[in-house]
From Swiss-Prot:
Binding-site positions, ATP: 11-19, 38, 121
Subcellular location: Cytoplasm
Recorded GO MF terms: argininosuccinate synthase activity; ATP binding
Listed CDD domains: ASS
Residues annotated to bind L-citrulline: 91, 96, 127, 131, 182, 191, 267, 279
Protein name, UniProt field: Argininosuccinate synthase
Transmembrane region(s): none
Chief localization: cytoplasm
Gene Ontology biological-process annotations: argininosuccinate metabolic process; L-arginine biosynthetic process; urea cycle
Reaction catalysed by this enzyme: L-citrulline + L-aspartate + ATP = 2-(N(omega)-L-arginino)succinate + AMP + diphosphate + H(+)
Organism in which the protein naturally occurs: Rhodospirillum centenum (strain ATCC 51521 / SW)
Pfam families membership: Arginosuc_syn_C, Arginosuc_synth
């Protein structure tokens, strides 16, 4: 149903999909279109998106390009990294964590301009449609959502290219003259999907990567980097205090220089199918390794293990789009409550694709040399271990005795 919409706010990147959607909304809904482009540190000039929107008939006052980099890292990336979050054991959720912020700002703009609908460019096969729309409905329950991929007949990238050519919409080309990979980029990562990557057996072309050198071509000498944490969040790199966005930018530079953070993954989408994606997350990988190293000497054992138990659930909530859900907020409160003592400095060694913790120190350290030393000590009576072991072995002994009796 295409009637009843007077003004719609479109999440607009200036790329193929959303440029076609912009024109399609104008033709199909005959409504006023407001474009919103989020600067999340994707590393590209955003003014062309403004120019393209104007070329397609959008009035200047209806074009919003917002710098959200600091908010993105401070309020979304850092809280997620406090949990050491990994989806299916490997994915650092670079795409997933950006969607709640985009949804939030899109709804704010809709309220500001009096729009009665919002629209996005996510396909009907992927996770992003769910992530965007769960955010919309959580923040504005009565909003109308337009999802063109679920309405139109343009059911392939070839069809989109034909539509763009017909309407003289300029589309970016890669260096071989073909339509580029489907990508998503922000300060945390860049992802690649489509084209040859749809065959999970095919190795990605090296010229696809933009944020990291090939590990085998990384410097032949290791580099050490120190990351300082305060209450679980990074605040400085090599002694220099930086804003959240600047800090992640610097970690991206360091990690990318040493070929760190590449991931080739087949993941389970929320909608039920498997998909293959290739990711570059250099700074996020350094941050993940360092934060875990910081927790290793500052967190109580059972608090750490509890975090490890809830982390997969927390990661699944973010991956599936439930950032604004009460259960995610409850888990966040638990996670944040563990971070007050996660303070100190972690030293990493970067070398040809690897990042290893080689040093850590904290004013809140629970590591006690006088207790763990292999040398003589006066604080720990090793005889105490005997009773501890026997008590923990009691159920095992009783179980075996019962089995022996038949």
């Amino acid at each position: 149903m295409t009637s009843g919409v007077k003004k719609v706010v479109l999440a607009y990147s200036g790329g193929l999909d959303t440029s076609v959607i912009l024109k399609w909304l104008q033709e199909t809904y005959r409504c006023e279109v407001v474009t919103f482009t989020a600067d999340l540190g994707q590393g590209e000039e955003l003014e062309p998106a403004r120019a393209k929107a104007q070329m397609l008939g959008i009035r200047p006052e209806n074009i919003f390009i917002d710098d959200l980099r600091e908010e993105f890292v401070r309020d979304f990336v850092f809280p997620m990294f406090r949990a050491n979050t990994l989806y299916e054991g490997t994915y650092l959720l670079g795409t997933s964590i950006a969607r709640p912020l985009i949804s939030k700002r899109q709804i704010e703009i809709a309220n500001l301009v009096g729009a009665d609908a919002v629209a996005h460019g996510a396909t009907g096969k992927g996770n992003d449609q769910v992530r965007f729309e769960l955010g919309y409905y959580a923040l504005k329950p009565d909003v109308r959502v337009i999802a063109p991929w679920r309405e139109w007949q343009l059911n392939s990238r070839t069809a989109l290219l034909d539509f763009a050519e017909k309407h003289q919409i300029p589309i970016a080309k890669d260096k071989r003259g073909e339509a580029p990979y489907s990508t998503d980029a922000n300060l945390l990562h860049i992802s690649y999907e489509g084209k040859a990557l749809e065959d999970p057996w095919v190795e990605p072309d090296e010229d696809m990567f933009t944020r990291s050198v090939a590990p085998e071509k990384a410097p032949d000498e290791p580099e050490y980097v120190e990351i300082e944490f305060a209450k679980g969040d990074p605040v400085a790199v090599n002694g220099q205090r930086l804003s959240p966005a600047a800090l992640l930018t610097e970690l991206n530079r360091l990690g990318g220089k040493h070929g760190i953070g590449r991931l080739d993954l087949v993941e389970n989408r929320f909608v039920g199918m498997k998909s293959r994606g290739v990711y570059e997350t250099p700074g996020g990988t350094l941050l993940s390794v360092a934060h875990r190293g910081m927790e290793s000497i500052t967190l109580d054992r059972e608090a750490m293990h509890l975090k490890d138990e809830v982390m997969p659930r927390y990661a699944k909530l973010i991956y599936n789009g439930f950032w604004f859900s009460p259960e995610r907020e409850a888990l966040q409160a638990l996670i944040d409550s563990t971070q007050a003592r996660v303070n100190g400095v972690v030293r990493l060694k970067l070398f040809k694709g690897s990042a290893r913790v080689v040093g850590r120190q904290s004013p809140n350290s629970l590591y006690r040399l006088d207790y763990v030393t292999f040398e003589a000590d006066s604080v720990y009576n090793q005889k105490d271990a005997e009773g501890f072991i026997k008590l923990n072995a009691l159920r095992l002994r009783l179980g075996t005795i019962a089995k022996q009796k038949g």
